[in-house]
C-alpha cells in the first residue's frame, strides 16, 4: 500500500532532491503540520514546488506524449530509445512515458495547496486567492494531460494525510474527469486568479482560458469552447485588433516570433513576481514550461538539444518525417515562399537530406551542449497562435467555415503565403475543412507537442498513422499503463485495451 502511494501520490519534495529518487522521500503528511502552510512564505514555496514538479514531469514527457507517436518525426539514427518505440508504435509497459507517477506527484502537491492555503496567515486576500487559482488550474492541467494520455484515470481531490489509511481508487472515465474535475477546477481558477498576474512561467487568466477552451473541445462542447476563446480575445485583444496594453498578442512578424522562441529570457534575472513579465514586452507566449538550471537545478535542463538537435549540421534524436518534409519542401518550391521553412527548420547534415526542427535556435546557428542546457529554453504549452487555430477548428465544427478560414489567414499572412489560403469552395464536407486546419496546425506548430493530441481528439490516428507505423485500432490512441503501476495497484486498474 505504501508503495503505490509513493508512486501515484508522492508529496512535496524538499529543494534539490533529484527526480529519480522521489519515491524515497517522506510525504508531506509526515512533516509536522505546524511547520507547513502557515504563512505567505510557506505557501509561496508550496506553489513553487507545484511548478518544479510539473517541469520534472514534462521535461521528457512533453515530447513523448505530444509529439513522438505522430507523423511529425522519424529517427535520425536507429538507436534504442523511448522515442524509437513511440515512433515505431512498439509500445511496451516498461516505457517511462507510460508511468503516471510524476504527474500524480504534481496533483498531490496541488491537493495539499488547495486544502491548506485557505488557513494560511496571508493578509492580502487577492494574493491568497491567486495562490489557490494556481493550484486549481495546475491540478486541472495535470488531469487534462492524464486523460489525454491514458483515458480513464484515478481521481484524487484530497491530499493523502496518512499513507496507512490511503485508498487505491479505481479509474474514472475520461469524459467524467473532464466534466466533473478538469472544467470545474479551471472555472474555479478563473474566478480566483488575479488578472494582473502576467508571468508566463506561471498560470495567468489568459492561460486558464486556453486550458479551459482546450478541455471543452475534448469534451465536444464546441459552443462553450468558442465562448471561452471569445472571453480571451475580449480581455487581450484579437489578432485583427490587439489591445495596446496586452502582454499577450498574435505576433504578425515571423522574425520577432522566432526571437521569442530563441532569446527573450536569456540572461534575464528571475524576479519571483507574478505581476512582472520577465519577457519585458508583448509576445505570443501565454504559458510555458520554463527550463532554467540556475533556477531549478541540474535536473531541469532543456531537452531541446537532445531531441531536435543543436544546430546546423549537428545530429539529433529525430528529424522531420518524409511526409512532413515533403510538405515543407513543396512550400518553398512555389512563389511566394513560406517563411517558416527557414525559421522553423534547418538541414540535419551537410547534404540536407533531412531536416531538424530549429525553432528554438537562431537561424544558421550551431550551439554546443553546455550552452544549450544553460539557456533558459521554454517549452510552449500555449501561445496566441494556439488560440487562433483552436478557434478555427471550433468554427469549422460549428459550420462557420468562412470564419474558420479567416482565422487561418492570420497564420498564413505571417508565413508570407497569404495568397495560399483555401476557399470555401475547396471543401465539400466539414471533415475536409477540419483536415485542412489540422494540416495547417501541423506545419505551424511542429515541435510544440500538439500533433498527437490533435490526431487523437479528432479520431484521425488510424487514418494518418496506419500507413506509417501500422496503428490499426482506435484503442491505440491511448498509452498503456506502466506495469509497475499495475503490479502495485492490487487489481484496482485494468490495462488499456490492446496492451
Model-found features: residue ranges?
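Bacterial Sec-dependent N-terminal signal peptides
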Residues: 1-30
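Acidic, glycine-rich segments characteristic of secretory precursors and extracytoplasmic regions
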Residues: 20-67, 112, 175, 492-499
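Elongated scaffold/linker segments in the mid-to-C-terminal portions of large proteins
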Residues: 38-42, 47, 51, 58, ...
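Conserved, well-structured interaction surfaces
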Residues: 39, 44-58, 79-150, 172-180, ...
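Alpha-helical solenoid repeat scaffolds, predominantly canonical TPR units
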Residues: 109, 113, 185, 228-231, ...
Amino acid at each position: 500500500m505504501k508503495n503505490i502511494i509513493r508512486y501515484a501520490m508522492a508529496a512535496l519534495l524538499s529543494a534539490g532532491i533529484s527526480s529519480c529518487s522521489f519515491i524515497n522521500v517522506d510525504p508531506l503528511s509526515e512533516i509536522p503540520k505546524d511547520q507547513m502552510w502557515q504563512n505567505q512564505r510557506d505557501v509561496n514555496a508550496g506553489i513553487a514546488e507545484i511548478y518544479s514538479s510539473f517541469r520534472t514531469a514534462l521535461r521528457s514527457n512533453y515530447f513523448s506524449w505530444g509529439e513522438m507517436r505522430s507523423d511529425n518525426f522519424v529517427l535520425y539514427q536507429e538507436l534504442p530509445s523511448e522515442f524509437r518505440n513511440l515512433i515505431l508504435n512498439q509500445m511496451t509497459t516498461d516505457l517511462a512515458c507510460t508511468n503516471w507517477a510524476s504527474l500524480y506527484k504534481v496533483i498531490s502537491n496541488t491537493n495539499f495547496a488547495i486544502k491548506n492555503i485557505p488557513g494560511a496567515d496571508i493578509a492580502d486576500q487577492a494574493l491568497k486567492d491567486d495562490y489557490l487559482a494556481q493550484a486549481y488550474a495546475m491540478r486541472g492541467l495535470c488531469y487534462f494531460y492524464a486523460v489525454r494520455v491514458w483515458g480513464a484515470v484515478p481521481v484524487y481531490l484530497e491530499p493523502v494525510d496518512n499513507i496507512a489509511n490511503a485508498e487505491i481508487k479505481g479509474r474514472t472515465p475520461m469524459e467524467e474527469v473532464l466534466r466533473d474535475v478538469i472544467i470545474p477546477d479551471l472555472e474555479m481558477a478563473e474566478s480566483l486568479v488575479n488578472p494582473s498576474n502576467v508571468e508566463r512561467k506561471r498560470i495567468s487568466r489568459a492561460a486558464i482560458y486556453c486550458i479551459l477552451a482546450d478541455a471543452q473541445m475534448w469534451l465536444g462542447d464546441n459552443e462553450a469552447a468558442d465562448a471561452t476563446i471569445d472571453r480571451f480575445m475580449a480581455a487581450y485583444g484579437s489578432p485583427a485588433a490587439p489591445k495596446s496594453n496586452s502582454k499577450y498578442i498574435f505576433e504578425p512578424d515571423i522574425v520577432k516570433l522566432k526571437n521569442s522562441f530563441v532569446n527573450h529570457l536569456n540572461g534575464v534575472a528571475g524576479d519571483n513576481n507574478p505581476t512582472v513579465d520577465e519577457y519585458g514586452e508583448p509576445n505570443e507566449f501565454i504559458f510555458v514550461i520554463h527550463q532554467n538550471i540556475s533556477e531549478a537545478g541540474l535536473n531541469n535542463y532543456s531537452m531541446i538539444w537532445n531531441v531536435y538537435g543543436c544546430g546546423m549540421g549537428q545530429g539529433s534524436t529525430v528529424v522531420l518525417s518524409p511526409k512532413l518534409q515533403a510538405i515543407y519542401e513543396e512550400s518553398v518550391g512555389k512563389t511566394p515562399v513560406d517563411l517558416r521553412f527557414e525559421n522553423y527548420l534547418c538541414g540535419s547534415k551537410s547534404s540536407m537530406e533531412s531536416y531538424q526542427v530549429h525553432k528554438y535556435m537562431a537561424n544558421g546557428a550551431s550551439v554546443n551542449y553546455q550552452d544549450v542546457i544553460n539557456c533558459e529554453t521554454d517549452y510552449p504549452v500555449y501561445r496566441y497562435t494556439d488560440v487562433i487555430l483552436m478557434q478555427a477548428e471550433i468554427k469549422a465544427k460549428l459550420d462557420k467555415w468562412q470564419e474558420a478560414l479567416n482565422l487561418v489567414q492570420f497564420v498564413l499572412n505571417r508565413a508570407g503565403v497569404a495568397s495560399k489560403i483555401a476557399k470555401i469552395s475547396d471543401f465539400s464536407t466539414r471533415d475536409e475543412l477540419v483536415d485542412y486546419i489540422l494540416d495547417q496546425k501541423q506545419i505551424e506548430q511542429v515541435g510544440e507537442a500538439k500533433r498527437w493530441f490533435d490526431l487523437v481528439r479528432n479520431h484521425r490516428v488510424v487514418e494518418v498513422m496506419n500507413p506509417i507505423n501500422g496503428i490499426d485500432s482506435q484503442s491505440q490512441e491511448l498509452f498503456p499503463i506502466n506495469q509497475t503501476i499495475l503490479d502495485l495497484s492490487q487489481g484496482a486498474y485494468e490495462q488499456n485495451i490492446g496492451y
